[in-house]
């Protein structure tokens, strides 16, 4: 069986933690920020975790992370 290839786009967006969870960044922070409240923008800077429903798909994209 050949080696699995890492999805390069996913590798730039996700990181595996020591416990096996997958960290991700929040969306909606690239542009059109003047209409967002400061509190909202501050909350969006924090990282989040990939949901259980998506965990298997993302884990397959980054097999060696």
From Swiss-Prot:
Keywords: Ribonucleoprotein, Ribosomal protein. The keyword Ribosomal protein applies. GO terms for molecular function: structural constituent of ribosome. InterPro entries: Ribosomal_bL35, Ribosomal_bL35-like, Ribosomal_bL35_CS, Ribosomal_bL35_sf. GO terms for cellular component: cytosolic large ribosomal subunit. Residues 1-28 are annotated as: Disordered. Gene3D superfamilies: 4.10.410.60. This is Large ribosomal subunit protein bL35. The lineage of its organism: Bacteria, Pseudomonadati, Acidobacteriota, Terriglobia, Terriglobales.
């Amino acid at each position: 069986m050949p080696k699995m290839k890492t999805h390069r786009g996913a590798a730039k967006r996700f990181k595996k933690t020591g416990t096996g969870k997958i960290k991700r960044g929040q969306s909606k922070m690239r542009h059109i920020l003047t209409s967002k409240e400061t509190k909202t923008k501050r909350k969006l800077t924090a990282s989040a975790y990939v949901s259980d429903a998506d965990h298997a798909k993302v884990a397959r994209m980054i097999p060696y992370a």
